[in-house]
Amino acid sequence: MEKESVYNLALKCAERQLTSMEFSNLYKEFFNEKFPSLIQEEEEDTTTTANINEVKKASDLVDTPSNNTAATADTTHLHEALDIVCSDFVKILNLEKPLILADYIVEVLLVNYNSDMIKCFLPKLNSVRNSLLLAHFFSKSCSFFAKLSDTLIIDQVRKDLGNVIVPNILSLDMNSMNKELIAIVSKLLQTTLKLSPSPILLTSAGCKNGSFTLLNQLSQTNKLLFKRVSQTFEAKLHFKDTKPFLNKDSTNEFVGSPSLTSPQYIPSPLSSTKPPGSVNSAAKYKDMKLLRYYKNIWLNNKIINWEISNPDFLSKYSAITSSIFQESFNSVQNLDQLLTDLIETSFTCFAQFVSNKQYHQANSNLTLLERKWVIFITKHLPLLILENSSRSPRVVTNALDNIDEKVVKAIRIYFTEKDDNKTNNEDLFDDYPSTSLDIRHDFIKGLIMLNLQPASVINNYLREDQMIDTSILPTRDDLFVRNLQGIQEVVHNTNSFIISSLDTLELESITESITHDSSNGLFQVLHNFESVAPTKQREIVKAFLSIFEDAIKELNYNRIAKICALLFFNFSHSLTTILSFSSPAALMKTLIKFVDLSRNGRNGSNGNDESSEYETINISLSFSWAILLIINLTQTYGISVVDVALKYPELSIKNSFIINFISNLPNVSDKYYLEESNVNDSDMLTKSHNTVQSWLCDLFVNGSITDQLIQNIETRQLANLIPFIVKQVLLSVEIGVLTDISSLIGGFEYFLQPLLLVGLIKTFYWLEQFLSCVKNDTISEDILQGIFNLLNTLFNPVTLNEDSKAFHTAVLRLNAIPLLKVLRKFRVQSQSNYGIYSSDAQGDPNLEPLIAKLVAVLNVSPVYDVDPRIINSENDYSRKQLGYGKFLILNENPINKIMTNQINSFWSLHSSTYYNLDYLFELIELVTPKSFLFDVLKTLEYKLATYGVPGSENKRGSLDSEHVFDYFFYFLVLYDVKTAEEASQLIEYMENDAKKSKGDVDIKGEDLHEKNDSAEVRQETQPKAEATQDDDFDMLFGENDTSTQAYEEEEENEDNDGNNRTNNVPMIKAEETPSKTNKISILKRHSFAVLLHERKLLNDLALENGEITKTENEKFISYHDKYLCMLKTCVF
């Protein structure tokens, strides 16, 4: 028996494949025989348990040497025995043997819970080198703790957590563990810590270092698990003499959200370069509401940049305060408090958004950013609450109850006016009862569907005279569709549902059904996408995009065309919602790869083969639909093809068809080349000339196109050939060379065939500039009618192929707004009406169908950033001129006044920008980033030097001025940067002080000679008086009024439509793929970071040459360093 060991026993049991319970029984018998004295002592201890208190008291009173010696001997004997057994366990774990060996150890240690043995065994785990068995041991242990229900064992585990289990696990060598082991250890710690009812205090520095190492390793491999584990650590682990993981937003625990009327004390951000005594000065900024501003800008940027679905969104939001403020906080904000704060902040920011829209940007239509906000609040917030809260209903109700009344009023009035079609000239203080609902109720409905709130709660947030029948509200997140019999069915398998729906979907029907009563399930879901529960929306998005990627890999052209078409039309804002749940750049990358890398596949195909012809049509349509979707993503959502190509190395810029195509959308060359990259090849030029001649002959002479002609040209070549032909024909008609329009109509009708539809894309963009020129030229009425007649062949065909119907509607939508603008100019005024209102207008009989068609296609599905009067019924007596631009920035105010309003907002440290961010971004593009930056800097310098900071007791203090620049540079950084990766690259770029020659710097040398008065200083003769804080709607949120409406009248003949650009398609020049060193500077070529850094390098050169003074250089370096400091501290 002396030679036997637990090690040998375990091996024999494993060979016989005994269960862990059977091993446990044999182990107990072995231990009884191996260490009989310990068993006897244990039994004796058990029989005397009732007298343990008396014995303990006696031992305390009489501490004899004999007693001490006996106790020490027993303890030593026990430790020796346990050490022998635990050493055998370690030997077992180091074997390359069956996994059941680890089960045996878990059974002995945990199932038959032995605190002394665990304390002896865990420190030895560092000597285990077999990661497979070790991982299995930890996994089984995790499973045991997760299922543990025995209260006696739970009590003992809780006692051992702080001094045995957690310290020993955190003391393991985390650096030597692989990814799988790191994840398993993290899950084990997360599971065991959940058993602790209160935080555990750890005093060992090794534990602290181990936790940081573990989280660091985990963050690189599993971000979702990292978020959960870090949240558990924040709540359950405290280290001696260290700050908690998550800091609360303020020293006052009740300041969890922006207060609108009476903001509590919020510490001011302090730069690391400020003097130590500046902390006392921070108390003077009680009314600056800086924290509200930082959260407002951060949330808006996350929503604008499609970052709201990131798994680390909540943890990043929680880190805003600690990243900006250097104050130390002692209290920990748990997840419920954090979510309450996020809910309040979101509604406050949304109220500020709609208020800016109503009172500062009354001539703009900000529907895209507004829709993004609505999706975030009604879909993403409920998901965050579902996955991170304790499920307590009070998390939401507390937040909704704490929202300031002015926020509620602003939201309510906005939605009431939106529903009732009121004008902004009515009484702003009118607060009459209305039955309209607002975004708060849509938010609550989403929570009800996820069982996070009872249905009855919605009535608590209605007016006293309102009531909703809660029985009709859905209380489950099931996805319903209506079958052919009209019966609703529940969708159980989303993936198979989408695939089957796509296979049965008829593409031509998606734009024909006005009532949207199609029996196709996917069509129904997308047309009612706003009413789908957030969980199902996310599930649909994931499955939909996965199916799309598979279709592209498998070259399932029919499915590709259908998916692109459904996404393009954005039914019920489905595409916008899909982009909010996914990565728009990833979708764009997939589309670019498909368009650029896929081959045409039509060359040499047999035109007589019916299946081959069907496949040829599918190939051509899938290619054409993909181009339409790319243009839509670029034009509507601002996703740049060049930026995406720069981001992904597998995409080419130089030889990209789609980048070149989009860059030249409105331009049709006077010469046609089959291969534009090889224009000097004489053979290619001859072939191109012959191709054009053959097509013109077949279209307008022979009256039919031969199969050989179609088979010998690729779809991408047709995309440029057909616009070229249309241009030559229309120009010939305009100058009177072609007069027989009837002979041309037949040829134009061919352009509507499925294989040739791709040519209409460029055609409709070019038509805008062509019609503008025609309007400005003096041509006869007959020629004008002939042009309109030809255009009606393309706009309103008498017959249209079934495969062409949906695409025809889609391609008309792309450039419909600019075309409507120019076509309406051809209308003739029938009466003057003294110029009071826009009077009745009449157009050519061939003109009105063109306008009506464009209005009709725009009403098929949502359009963004468009004056709703453009696409609604004709309003002959509209008080305001129709605005066709995205933002009519100069229609009501001159640029000086607009800039002054915004600069005053920066200067006064308001809790939001004066104008909404999307409007501001357009403004920056209009005036150029360079002018915006230096105008704001020079004006702020002047205002701070002359007036100081409004609302500050120490108005002229240098620290006060620092806060204003911190405020402004925070805006600049978040304007430039979308992700932490971009921030890291920009930091590396800006910290590179290598000298450049003047030729290498983008900024012109003469800019150095600008004096302080070269940029117009936006100033008033005197600072404006403070606005009273109880004014409900002059700056709704208790800030000073920065409006400059009292300025002297500007000249009325200024350019009032500076933003009515012909189209929104950027002109991009394809370049060589950039090297790694300058990639970020090209990707961020329009950023303030590149502007500041290039100017800094140029200033350094100028200082060496004596062109500027050292003081001027140091002043600019301080701005460069402030941007860099903010770049390092901001949360992305």
From Swiss-Prot:
Compositional bias (Basic and acidic residues): 998-1023
Query: What's in the keyword line of the UniProt record?
Result: Activator, Nucleus, Transcription, Transcription regulation
Question: Region Disordered: what ranges?
Answer: 998-1070
Q: Name one GO cellular component term.
A: nucleus
| Biological process terms in GO annotation | positive regulation of transcription elongation by RNA polymerase II; positive regulation of transcription initiation by RNA polymerase II; regulation of transcription by RNA polymerase II; RNA polymerase II preinitiation complex assembly; transcription by RNA polymerase II
Q: Where in the cell is it found?
A: Nucleus
Q: Which GO MF terms does the UniProt record name?
A: transcription coregulator activity
Taken from the UniProt record, the cysteine pairs bridged by disulfide bonds within this chain are: none
Q: Does the keyword Transcription regulation apply?
A: yes
- Main site of residence? nucleus
Q: Spell out the InterPro entries in the cross-references.
A: Mediator_Med5_fun
Q: Which regions are flagged for Acidic residues bias?
A: 1047-1057
Subunit relationships: Component of the Mediator complex, which is composed of at least 21 subunits that form three structurally distinct submodules. The Mediator head module contains MED6, MED8, MED11, SRB4/MED17, SRB5/MED18, ROX3/MED19, SRB2/MED20 and SRB6/MED22, the middle module contains MED1, MED4, NUT1/MED5, MED7, CSE2/MED9, NUT2/MED10, SRB7/MED21 and SOH1/MED31, and the tail module contains MED2, PGD1/MED3, RGR1/MED14, GAL11/MED15 and SIN4/MED16. The head and the middle modules interact directly with RNA polymerase II, whereas the elongated tail module interacts with gene-specific regulatory proteins.
Report the family membership: Belongs to the Mediator complex subunit 5 family.
Q: What does this protein do?
A: Component of the Mediator complex, a coactivator involved in the regulated transcription of nearly all RNA polymerase II-dependent genes. Mediator functions as a bridge to convey information from gene-specific regulatory proteins to the basal RNA polymerase II transcription machinery. The Mediator complex, having a compact conformation in its free form, is recruited to promoters by direct interactions with regulatory proteins and serves for the assembly of a functional preinitiation complex with RNA polymerase II and the general transcription factors.
What miscellaneous comment appears in this entry? Present with 2491 molecules/cell in log phase SD medium.
Query: What is the designated name of this protein?
Result: Mediator of RNA polymerase II transcription subunit 5
- Give the organism, scientific name: Saccharomyces cerevisiae (strain ATCC 204508 / S288c)
Traced from the root, the source organism's taxonomic lineage reads:
Eukaryota, Fungi, Dikarya, Ascomycota, Saccharomycotina
What would be the name of the gene that encodes this protein?
NUT1
